[in-house]
Amino acid sequence: MKKEFYNIAKLVTQNSKILDVGCGNGELMKYITENISKDIRGIELSKSNIQKCVEKGLTVIEGNAEIDLKQFPDSSFDFVILSQTLQAFLDPENVLNELLRIGKKAIVSIPNFGHWKVRLHLLLKGTMPVTENLPNEWYNTPNLHMCTIK
């Protein structure tokens, strides 16, 4: 499992109610289910990732977070997790506002496009790197916004 997922899981309290927005293949959800809280569900756009979640026995809703988060009542969850997904939204500010509305606490992580390894790769090879965290070629990416820590 990605180190980032362990760091996120450490922030979640035992037996809390959790929504994982853009849950991907369910790797983080599965870890949380087995170790922290059984009351977790995800929302995911990709049909293939939804299938992977279902195969793992996870509860997942097919949906677009930019539209479908509005359907949840205020303070529905103790934690709302958005991992490596914010940069792919057309209106990230609206998504963040929805996370704060439906969750008592929001945990957000982003890919750091300014990381020294990314910049070094760009300098030496002239291309954006393709890695586990940045798995797409620059011309075929869902990332609409490039994020850095500062």
Which role does the model predict for each range below?
Residues 21:
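Conserved beta-strand/loop positions that form the S-adenosyl-L-methionine
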Residues 93-101, 105-150:
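S-adenosyl-L-methionine-dependent methyltransferase catalytic module, highlighting the catalytic core
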Residues 1-15:
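Conserved alpha-helix/loop element of class I SAM-dependent methyltransferases that forms part
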Residues 31-68:
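Class I SAM-dependent methyltransferase SAM/SAH-binding core
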Residues 25:
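Conserved SAM/SAH-binding loop
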Residues 79-90:
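A short SAM/SAH-binding and catalytic strip from SAM-dependent methyltransferases
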Residues 68-74:
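Short conserved loop adjoining the S-adenosyl-L-methionine
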